[in-house]
C-alpha cells in the first residue's frame, strides 16, 4: 500500500502512465490501440482487509505503508466502498468497549456489494467461545438496524457463521442484471464497476460467435454466465470447491441453461482433452460433442502452464484476461506464432498501484 499515491486529483495522469507503459511493453505483438476502462477514483474496492492495533483502551484499523515502511492508522480508507467506510466507523464503536469481541482480535475483513450487502469477518488469535458467539449475535442485531450485514468469526481451525458466509452481488451488464454469489475468503473481482466493464467488453468481443465456448479457471462463473448468451453451449472448469458451488448457485439463480461446470484443474482438463487420462468427474459428459471455436482463460498470476497453453493454441479464437502483464507477455510469445491480437484492453481494477488487468482477443492468423 502507498497511501501518498491515492490522490483522486492525479488519477487520470496515473492511468495514462499505465496505458503508455502497457502499449510499450506489448509493441512487439503489433497490438491495436489499447481500449482503456477507467475506475472510479475513490470508493471502488468492494473488499478490504485491515490489521487491528490495540493501544490501551483504544483499538483501530491499520495497514502497512511500504513506502513509509511503517503502519498507518486507517479510520477511513479512500479505496474502499462507501458501505465499507460506513461499516468501519460503526463496527469499531461497538468493538472498543466489548472485552469479548476485541480480545486478541488481530484482523477484520470486509466484503461488500453494489447491491448493499456487507460481510464482516473477525479474525482472532484465540479460540471463540459461547460468550463470543452471544456478543457477536448481539453485535449483528445492532448493526442490522443500519446495514444488511452478516458476521463471521475465525480462529485457528475454527469458523463460526452467525447466518451465512456469502453475499449476493447484483451487476447491471448492458441490458441484463446478473446475480453472483460471492463466498467469504474466495476470489472475487475487487472493483465491481470495472468488473462490469470487463464483462461488457468480453460480451462485445465475442458477439456473433459460432459454436460453443470453453472456459478455464471460471471461478464463480463470473464471465461464463455473462458470455453464455453469445454461444450455443458453454463448458467451464474450476478446481476450488467453494467457487464451483457458488458457480452452480449462480447458474441456477440467473436461469442459464446452456452452461456446465466441471470441477477439475486446467491441467487435468488438458490431459482429458488430449485423451492422456480418463477422469471419473467427466463421466456422462461427451467432450467430443462440444464444438468450441472460442476459449476463454482468466488464469492466476503465474499464467498458463505449457500443456494448457498448447491446448489453448488449438482454438480459433482466444479471449485472455490477465492479472499479470508479464506472464501474459510470456504466453503471447507462443500464441503470437499462430494467432494475432485483434482487441487489447486495460481494465484499471487497482488504481494508484502498478497493477494492470488486461484483456486480449486473439484470432487465428
From Swiss-Prot:
Tell me which residues bind S-adenosyl-L-methionine.
Answer: 189, 217, 222, 238, 298
Give the CDD domains listed for this entry: AdoMet_MTases
The answer to whether the entry has keyword Mitochondrion is no
**Which residues are the active-site ones?**
323 (nucleophile), 357 (proton acceptor)
The enzyme's main class, written as a single word, is transferase
Cite the EC number.
2.1.1.-, 2.1.1.35
* Keyword set includes Electron transport: no
Q: Which UniProt keywords apply?
A: Methyltransferase, S-adenosyl-L-methionine, Transferase, tRNA processing
Q: Where are the transmembrane segments?
A: none
What catalytic activity is recorded?
uridine(54) in tRNA + S-adenosyl-L-methionine = 5-methyluridine(54) in tRNA + S-adenosyl-L-homocysteine + H(+); uridine(341) in tmRNA + S-adenosyl-L-methionine = 5-methyluridine(341) in tmRNA + S-adenosyl-L-homocysteine + H(+)
**UniProt xrefs under Gene3D superfamilies:** 2.40.50.1070, Vaccinia Virus protein VP39 (3.40.50.150)
> Among the record's GO biological process terms, what is one?
tRNA methylation
Any GO CC annotation of this UniProt entry: cytosol
Pfam families, alphabetized:
tRNA_U5-meth_tr
GO MF annotations, alphabetized: rRNA binding; tRNA (uracil(54)-C5)-methyltransferase activity, S-adenosyl methionine-dependent; tRNA binding
Report the protein's function.
Answer: Dual-specificity methyltransferase that catalyzes the formation of 5-methyluridine at position 54 (m5U54) in all tRNAs, and that of position 341 (m5U341) in tmRNA (transfer-mRNA).
Q: Which family does it belong to?
A: Belongs to the class I-like SAM-binding methyltransferase superfamily. RNA M5U methyltransferase family. TrmA subfamily.
Enumerate the NCBIfam families for this protein. trmA_only (TIGR02143)
Provide the protein name: tRNA/tmRNA (uracil-C(5))-methyltransferase
Q: What is the lineage of its organism?
A: Bacteria, Pseudomonadati, Pseudomonadota, Gammaproteobacteria, Alteromonadales
Q: Which gene encodes it?
A: trmA
